[in-house]
């Protein structure tokens, strides 16, 4: 396994629309496993392939403390939403910033697993939030897009300033 490089806001590659995975093969399995390793290394609970500059519809999630509970969803699609919940979210691509974002408390998701099987899962609370957050990434959407224009502009200026200082980000929005 190898660690993947996470893209940081305001890198425009975070806005790329992910393409569906056509075939589950060893390359896709390696990408998913590398994403899991990267998620743990960065102490996250979810990661979308677009966050590591892979424009494919793959997300990995684990909201539990045991590493055996990894959830890999390929070509995920939310088919049902219910209820409302809003808690502070963070993002590996927007480090050290959290905001309370409105989400659905309960979702049903159709996807394909790493064995190529079609699956349907139900998620609520933190797992629901995490899956919605990662699926947003596949659509080129960031959690800060739900904030007011004023807050988004402040965040962008902050990260552009960090970019200039650390030269961490190379591509701007």
From Swiss-Prot:
<protein>
    <recommendedName>
        <fullName>Peptide deformylase</fullName>
        <ecNumber>3.5.1.88</ecNumber>
    </recommendedName>
</protein>
<feature type="binding site">
    <location>
        <position position="91"/>
    </location>
    <ligand>
        <name>Fe cation</name>
    </ligand>
</feature>
<dbReference type="Pfam" id="PF01327">
    <property type="entry name" value="Pep_deformylase"/>
</dbReference>
<keyword id="KW-0648">Protein biosynthesis</keyword>
<feature type="binding site">
    <location>
        <position position="133"/>
    </location>
    <ligand>
        <name>Fe cation</name>
    </ligand>
</feature>
<dbReference type="GO" id="GO:0043686">
    <property type="term" value="P:co-translational protein modification"/>
</dbReference>
<feature type="active site">
    <location>
        <position position="134"/>
    </location>
</feature>
<dbReference type="InterPro" id="IPR036821">
    <property type="entry name" value="Peptide_deformylase_sf"/>
</dbReference>
<comment type="similarity">
    <text>Belongs to the polypeptide deformylase family.</text>
</comment>
<feature type="binding site">
    <location>
        <position position="137"/>
    </location>
    <ligand>
        <name>Fe cation</name>
    </ligand>
</feature>
<dbReference type="GO" id="GO:0046872">
    <property type="term" value="F:metal ion binding"/>
</dbReference>
<comment type="function">
    <text>Removes the formyl group from the N-terminal Met of newly synthesized proteins. Requires at least a dipeptide for an efficient rate of reaction. N-terminal L-methionine is a prerequisite for activity but the enzyme has broad specificity at other positions.</text>
</comment>
<dbReference type="GO" id="GO:0042586">
    <property type="term" value="F:peptide deformylase activity"/>
</dbReference>
<dbReference type="GO" id="GO:0006412">
    <property type="term" value="P:translation"/>
</dbReference>
<keyword id="KW-0479">Metal-binding</keyword>
<keyword id="KW-0408">Iron</keyword>
<dbReference type="InterPro" id="IPR023635">
    <property type="entry name" value="Peptide_deformylase"/>
</dbReference>
<keyword id="KW-0378">Hydrolase</keyword>
